[in-house]
Amino acid sequence: MKCLLLVSLFFLLPATAFAVPTKPEQFEKLENEFSLECQKYGAESCAARFISMAACTYVFAVNQGKHPDEAMDISDKLFVGIMRGNKIKPGIMFTEERNIKPSIVNEVAERTAFCKEATEKAVPKLFNARGMEEPSLEIQKRLTDSFGYWWISNIETIYKQD
């Protein structure tokens, strides 16, 4: 029940400082205290949930003024911590071809839609942070709609480099 409350606060109050952990003790607390019933949901579903939380944390951090690189570091630490805290090995997420399993991809796409508003706000900020011209509203919408897939693609790229 405590975890359900924490997750609810995490997604309902994205402007709070806790929504974007930045201090080592916040990451440690998440790792030690945030747990889902992964035996009930399955490790793959839990991994998809954690990937989605990391993706949403990224856009929350960007919207709070963090540079995209810093936002990525924050979301990576969050992901690693909650995966470790829930004793889920990253290898379970991948096929033999080193792609994220389709069931995880689909769940991440669904779950990242929960932070769609935050993603919409973050897209122009991401372009501005890189010194690029803001894309048209149509392109911003497409980027927002495909955010979960982009996030998955980044994870696959990193995993394939190892």
PLM feature spans:
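Compact alpha-helical subdomains of small soluble proteins
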Residues: M72-D162
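Immediate post-signal-peptide N-terminus of mature secreted/exported proteins
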Residues: A19-K66
